[in-house]
Amino acid sequence: MSRSQLWAAVVLLLLLQSAQGVYIKYHGFQVQLESVKKLNELEEKEMSNPQPRRSGLLPAVCHNPALPLDLQPVCASQEAASTFKALRTIATDECELCINVACTGC
């Protein structure tokens, strides 16, 4: 294998790896990191919205049609609010995501 072929293979591998995305697994749910970032955006918009919030057991974001598809099953859970909170916490912790090589257990 020539040096240019090896370089092309490395670049292709990196592109494929980044295209797959990062997934978070929590209590039987598997969601994309990008979906949790979108969840944060939606919740920030909900907080800044002066309209009255819906009452009920479900978090308000569960009523938002822009909620990513992989997060919608969480809304069917009785622990939806605590699950969303945990996902947001995990998404902001570099060691939980194994982004930082200095973290143990990655």
UniProtKB/Swiss-Prot annotation:
Endogenous activator of intestinal guanylate cyclase. It stimulates this enzyme through the same receptor binding region as the heat-stable enterotoxins. May be a potent physiological regulator of intestinal fluid and electrolyte transport. May be an autocrine/paracrine regulator of intestinal salt and water transport. GO terms for biological process: adipose tissue development; body fluid secretion; cGMP-mediated signaling; energy homeostasis; glucose homeostasis; multicellular organism growth; negative regulation of blood pressure; reduction of food intake in response to dietary excess. It is found in: Secreted. It comes from Mus musculus. Keywords: Disulfide bond, Secreted, Signal. GO terms for cellular component: extracellular region. Residues 1-21 form the signal peptide. Localized predominantly in intestinal villi and the corticomedullary junction of the kidney. One of its GO terms (molecular function) is guanylate cyclase activator activity. Residues 22-91 form a propeptide. Disulfide bonds join 62-75, 95-103, 98-106. This is Guanylate cyclase activator 2B. Belongs to the guanylin family. It comes from the Eukaryota.
